[in-house]
Amino acid sequence: MEKKYYALAYYYITRVDNPHEEIALHKKFLEDLDVSCRIYISEQGINGQFSGYEPHAELYMQWLKERPNFSKIKFKIHHIKENIFPRITVKYRKELAALGCEVDLSKQAKHISPQEWHEKLQENRCLILDVRNNYEWKIGHFDNATLPDIQTFREFPEYAEKLAQECDPETTPVMMYCTGGIRCELYSPVLLEKGFKEVYQLDGGVIAYGQQVGTGKWLGKLFVFDDRLAIPIDESDPDVAPIAECCHCQTPSDAYYNCANTDCNALFLCCDECIHQHQGCCGEECSQSPRVRKFDSSRGNKPFRRAHLCEISENSESASCCLI
C-alpha cells in the first residue's frame, strides 16, 4: 500500500523562555520519524513547515499540542505523496519572519475568518494588501489586490511609509494577507503605528482561505517554500490556469525553476518547452556560462538548493525559506 503524507504549515506567537532547549527537544522527538521539516523557534514562538508520513505527522501534532506553550497551536494540513524538504531542520531564529525592525506584537490588526474575508472582498470597500514577496504574488494573488514590488519582507516597513503617504490612514481600511498568517502578525503592528485605523488580517492566511472557502476570489496558484513551489489553494480544484508567463516565450506558465547556471541559480518562470530548449537556463548569457549544470528533466522543477534564491542573504528572511 502506498504511504500517505501530510504537509503542515503552522506558527504560534508565544513566550518561549528557553528556545534552545525547545529546539533540542524537537530534534530528539523527530530524529527517528519519517518526516522532514524547516522549523524556527525563538523567544517569540515557533514558525514551522513540516512534512511527514501521516501517522508520524499525527504523532508530532499531538506531541506539540501537549506542550504547555503550544497547546492552542493550529495546523494547516495538505495531503501530499512524499516528504517535501531535504532534511529535518530545527533552528534558532531571533525573528520568526525577518521584518528587520522591532514590533509590539501586543498591537494586532483584527483577525477575520476566511468566510468573513470572502464577504468583505465582495464589498469592494477595502485596500487589499498582499504582504508577500513579488515572486510569490506573481503566480497567484487575490483579485484586485495591491501587489508591492518587493523582494524581501525586510522592505515592508519602508513600504508602510509609502502607503501612508499615498492614501489617508484615517479613512483607508486595509485587508492584509500572506501565505499562512505569520507575516501579517508581524506587519500589522507596523501599519497600526503608521496611523491606519481599520486594519484586518486573514486568519490562517491564504492556506486557510483555500481550505475553508475554496478558490473563491483567488487567481492562480500559491507559492510555497518547499519542493512543490506552487500549489492550488483548493485541493479539490487542481486545474488552475496560470496567470504568469514564461520568461522566454511569454506563454502562460506558473512553473518556477532555478537557473542551471550555477553562478546565477535565480528562480525564473518557464514553460515545459522552453525549459528543455534552453537547457534549464534563464537566458542566453547564462546558457553560455562555463558553470552550467546538466539539466535533469526527471527532477521536474524541484528547487536546486545549493545556492537557491531563498539562500541569497543570511540577513534576509528569504534565507529561511520558512515564510508562511
From Swiss-Prot:
Any idea of its EC number? 1.14.-.-
* Catalytic residues as annotated in Swiss-Prot or TrEMBL: 178 (cysteine persulfide intermediate)
Give UniProt keywords alphabetically.
Oxidoreductase, tRNA processing
- SMART domains, sorted: RHOD
In the record, which residues are listed under signal peptide?
none
Q: Which InterPro entries does the record cross-reference, listed alphabetically?
A: Rhodanese-like_dom, Rhodanese-like_dom_sf, Rhodanese_C, TrhO, TRHO_N
Q: Which domain of life is it from?
A: Bacteria
One biological process term from GO is:
tRNA modification
- Kindly state which reaction or reactions the protein catalyses: uridine(34) in tRNA + AH2 + O2 = 5-hydroxyuridine(34) in tRNA + A + H2O
Which segments constitute the Rhodanese domain? 122-218
Q: Name one GO molecular function term.
A: oxidoreductase activity, acting on paired donors, with incorporation or reduction of molecular oxygen
Family assignment?
A: Belongs to the TrhO family.
In UniProt terms, what function does this protein have?
A: Catalyzes oxygen-dependent 5-hydroxyuridine (ho5U) modification at position 34 in tRNAs.
NCBIfam families per UniProt:
PRK00142.1-2, PRK00142.1-3
This protein's name: tRNA uridine(34) hydroxylase
Per the UniProt entry, what species is this protein from, by scientific name?
Chlamydia pneumoniae (Chlamydophila pneumoniae)
Write the gene name. trhO
